[in-house]
Amino acid sequence: MSKCLQQLKRQLQHFGIDGCSLADGDIDYFFTVTGIDRGWGCGWRNIQMLISWLQYTNPNWFKRNFSSGNYEINSLQSLLLSAWMKGIDAEGYAQLGDNLHGKWIGATEVYSLFTGLFVNVALVDFDFRSEASASNALFLYVKKHFESSNDTSNVSPCYLQFQGHSIIIIGFCSSLETLVVLDPDRYQSVQKKFVNIADFNHCYMRKKRSLKFSQFQLVHFKQNIFLNDFSSKLEVRSTRISDF
């Protein structure tokens, strides 16, 4: 499904939901497929969504890096291997190895792939004693991120990793205290024509109670979005938010 943000804005208006700060630009929805990548492909599908956002907001960068227009999973696997060969996250390469077919990836691999494409990536680790503290810190960070819009840079979507799954956050809704998300495992829901607000919220909105984890990893693009050189980012470093 293409141009999800435009469609989402219309649906928010239709249901009278206000107070939502969304990513700038637009984004296409990619989903896992049973028998192909369901169970391991969520990270790759989320990368596709982030690339589509860059295609809308930075078309010249997209043309340089994806001149064929192809960013299927096998192409992304080659890009991740290329980033590792450049020396980015040698530890991750040692763990996953050369054959990425059918392999689940996480936030550090997202960091590595985009760094290899000279995109300036922020990686944030949330590590708390309690699930409530972790979700409170996550929601506060995401709220600030999406409310930081200005005239000189685009506010990007976020990649959110938690136990066993990952999703894309495309906004924050203050009136509902929810994350606005695209879940690569919820194709049927996203494709629906919503007739009531409950179904719409179930598909796109995530409250704290639906994210009961004590650890999260978040990836987003920085406001100075491109790098001239990534030699200082070969080792994966994160911002740690914790109560330990």
UniProtKB/Swiss-Prot annotation:
An annotated GO BP: meiotic cell cycle
Segments traversing the membrane: none
Functional note: Deubiquitinase with endodeubiquitinase activity that preferentially cleaves 'Lys-48'-linked polyubiquitin chains. Shows only weak activity against 'Lys-63' and 'Lys-11'-linked chains. Has a role in meiosis.
Gene3D superfamilies in alphabetical order: 3.90.70.130
Enzyme nomenclature, EC number: 3.4.19.12
Native source species: Schizosaccharomyces pombe (strain 972 / ATCC 24843) (Fission yeast)
Annotated localization: Cytoplasm
Any single GO CC term annotated in Swiss-Prot or TrEMBL for this entry: cytoplasm
Protein name: Ubiquitin carboxyl-terminal hydrolase mug105
Site-annotated residues for Involved in the stabilization of negative charge on the oxyanion by the formation of the oxyanion hole: 161
Family as reported in the entry's similarity comment: Belongs to the peptidase C78 family. ZUFSP subfamily.
Chief location: cytoplasm
